[in-house]
Design a protein with these regions (language model features):
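Helix-start (N-cap) detector for alpha-helical repeat units in TPR-like alpha-solenoids
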Residues: 45, 93-94, 127-128, 160-162
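Conserved structural position within tetratricopeptide repeats
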Residues: 84-87, 117-121, 154-155
Length: 171
C-alpha cells in the first residue's frame, strides 16, 4: 500500500512539473510571452526612454521660460533618446506617442504623423493619439482628416473629443 502511495505522489509530481514547464519557453519567459509585456525596463534609470522623457520635460521647462535655444537642444536630445528606445521596442504605444509629440514640437509634422499613425496601427481607438493626430491634420490644413479623427472620438464622451472639437470649431 505504501508503494502505491509513493508511486502516486511521484507520478503526480512528474505530471505537475511537466505541465508547469509546458508554459515556459527556452528562456523561461512563458510560451505565450513575446517578451514585451513587461515594459518595466523602460523605467530603468539609464533607459533611453527615460532619458528621452527627462530631456522632453526639460525642453518644455526651457520653452516656458522663453529659453528657446536650450529648449531646442533638449528636444534634439529627446529625439535621439526616443529613436534609440524605438530601435529596442518599436511597438511601444507610449514611446510612439512621445515620438509623435517631439517631432511635432520641432516642426517635423511628417515624422510626427508617421509615428502617430504607427501608434494607431497598434491601438486604432486610442483617444489621445487620435486627438493629437486630429490636431496635426487641422494645423496642416487637412480639415477633412481632422474631422475624421473627431468622428472616431465622438463616441468616447472624453476630454480628447472636446479638445479636438474646440480646435476644429475655432473656439
Amino acid at each position: 500500500m505504501k508503494i502505491l502511495k509513493y508511486l502516486t505522489i511521484l507520478i503526480f509530481s512528474f505530471v505537475s512539473f511537466n505541465q508547469a514547464n509546458a508554459f515556459l519557453d527556452k528562456d523561461n519567459k512563458g510560451a505565450q510571452s513575446t517578451g514585451r509585456e513587461d515594459l518595466s525596463f523602460l523605467e530603468a534609470k539609464n533607459s533611453n526612454f527615460k532619458k528621452g522623457r527627462d530631456a522632453l520635460k526639460q525642453a518644455i521647462k526651457y520653452k516656458n521660460k522663453k529659453k528657446f535655444e536650450k529648449s531646442s537642444k533638449r528636444l534634439d536630445k529627446a529625439i535621439k533618446y526616443f529613436v534609440s528606445a524605438y530601435e529596442e521596442t518599436p511597438e511601444n504605444l507610449e514611446l510612439l506617442n512621445y515620438l509623435g509629440l517631439v517631432y511635432y514640437m520641432v516642426g517635423d509634422t511628417i515624422m510626427s504623423e508617421i509615428y502617430y499613425n504607427q501608434a494607431l496601427v497598434i491601438d486604432p481607438k486610442n483617444n489621445l493619439i487620435n486627438q493629437k493626430l486630429g490636431e496635426l491634420y487641422f494645423n496642416t490644413k487637412r480639415t477633412s482628416l481632422a474631422k475624421e479623427k473627431l468622428k472616431i472620438l465622438s463616441n468616447c464622451n472624453c476630454e480628447e473629443y472636446s479638445v479636438l472639437k474646440m480646435i476644429i470649431d475655432g473656439k
